[in-house]
Amino acid sequence: MNSLLWRKIVGASVIAALILPMSVSAAGIGSRPANPDPNNPRTQSIFIYNLSGGATKSDQLHLQNGLDEKATVEVYAVDGTVTATGDMTCKQKVEDKVDAGKWVNIPKQEITLEAKESKLVDFTVKVPGKVDVGEHNACIVVQRKNTQSLATGGVQIQTRQAVRMAIVVPGDIHRDVTID
């Protein structure tokens, strides 16, 4: 019985050793705002815009391949949402965009980066003319494109990295609550 347990542990360790290097290398793609506001340190890691209804803002995402190999990535926008614990999270690509994620247009959504290469990715935010005041959240997601076929077998790990976008629409917020 102990011999069987030992074989399972060794087998699992060998499988983990084969899989882990792939997952570590997948984390070598990164992004951040390309044009942070020098007066607001938070904009080094988050896009923060104050935009009125109907306004348009063009900006760039700094995309970097930290890997020693060429990588093709997808870049796309999704809605951001606040969790029950107050944390910010990004919706999935397959979910319908109903808020700020819908306002972001990224013309080039598939980008190939050579090893250690960086590129700037252009995008535009267009706030609808009629929109509620307050903060609206989106995420610009970067995800390495899966080039392996499922037919090759093994375990495939897909990771994504995102940069938060907070769009504040100015105005007075009126929240009237009536309790009967």
Where are these regions (language model features)?
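Short flexible coil/turn linkers enriched for glycine and charged/polar residues
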Residues: 67-69, 115-117, 159, 171-173
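Beta-sheet-dominated interaction scaffolds and their linkers
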Residues: 31-67, 71, 110-112, 177-180
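Bacterial N-terminal signal peptides
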Residues: 12-21
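Sec/Tat signal peptide C-region and signal peptidase I cleavage site
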Residues: 22-26
